[in-house]
Amino acid sequence: MADYPAVIEIPKGSRNKYEVDHETGRIRLDRLLFTSMSYPADYGYVEDSLGEDGDPLDALVLLDEPTFPGCQVLARPIGVFHMTDEAGGDDKLLCVPANDPRQAHVSELEHVNEFDRLEIQHFFETYKDLEPGKSVEGASWDGREDAERCVNEAIARASEAGLTTARWRLPNTSQH
């Protein structure tokens, strides 16, 4: 089981959709959710990754208390929710904080309460319902092995493209 640095953009319980501007590092308010829903877990992305949708790979981190936009959390992926939105494939990793002794026993998706998984699934299947031009197609949950495959592919994709989450080109080390 590997751990990965995740950057939180949106704390649990927020309706504000914050995004990190990967060129400036600033956090901006993208929009307020149109539905009367709030994020069911801290939400952000895995650093130095590139998802199928051209953005960093999304990650939810199950924490006892919400953090804040820009907070880095060392996260352990335990599952992945596969979904599609108007931009294409949009997988969501489900993670626990790697250094939290209260979560040390959580290593598989099945260790998370089924109702909590249903709540997360319901959120992502319906949170864009009232937004013009936006759509979501719910899909399915897969476990830790698939989550690790997704994150490793996303990190490789970013590396191959020469991108970090700051969108700065990586130095070309082959000439040194």
Name what the model sees in each region.
Residues M1-H176:
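Hydrophobic N-terminal alpha-helices or hydrophobic patches in metabolic proteins across all domains
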